[in-house]
């Protein structure tokens, strides 16, 4: 039987990734995004991936796996988006990865339902990543 309860004591990445190395890379990405207020340029992301491939964070993770598996999963589910952003230092528009605020209903849907699960996951993501 499927459980319709979300255990918030587990890390958010355990919900999306089953492999330990993917979870570690995803946790490192979320930590990096939090430290940069939810936005990273392509260059900052490339520097971050270099630290993963070199093993500076205590584990190694390949560039291809990171972009395809970890970042691809976050982008597929709509948690992270690649958006045009103004760069005042260069006086031009560049692409940056940004945390996406998930839409959450004011009134919780009845459970068990898919809408209930989607609402709870969105609320969990917003509590974890979105800082106003």
Ranges and model annotations:
Residues 2-39:
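Short alpha-helical segments that sit at the start of domains
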Residues 20, 24, 40, 65, ...:
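Alpha-helix boundary/N-cap detector
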Residues 36-39, 55, 77, 127, ...:
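Surface-exposed polar/charged interaction patches
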Residues 38-58:
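Short acidic, hydrophobic short linear motifs in intrinsically disordered regions
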Residues 63-72:
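Short, hydrophobic-biased segments on the C-terminal half of alpha helices
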Residues 72-86:
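A short, conserved structural fragment
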Residues 84-95:
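Short, Lys/Arg-rich nucleic-acid/phosphate-binding segment
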Residues 98-132:
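Short, amphipathic alpha-helical interaction segments positioned at domain boundaries
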């Amino acid at each position: 039987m499927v459980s319709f309860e979300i255990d918030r004591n587990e890390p958010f990445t355990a919900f999306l990734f089953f492999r330990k190395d993917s979870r570690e890379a995803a946790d490192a990405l979320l930590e990096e995004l939090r430290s940069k207020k939810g936005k990273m340029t392509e260059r900052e992301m490339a520097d971050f991936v270099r630290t993963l491939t070199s093993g500076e964070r205590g584990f190694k993770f390949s560039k291809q796996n990171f972009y395809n598996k970890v970042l691809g999963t976050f982008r597929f589910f709509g948690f992270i988006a690649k958006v045009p952003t103004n760069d005042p230092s260069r006086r031009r528009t560049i692409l940056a990865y940004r945390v996406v605020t998930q839409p959450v209903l004011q009134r919780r849907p009845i459970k068990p339902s898919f809408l209930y699960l989607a609402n709870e996951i969105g609320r969990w993501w917003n509590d974890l990543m979105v800082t106003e």
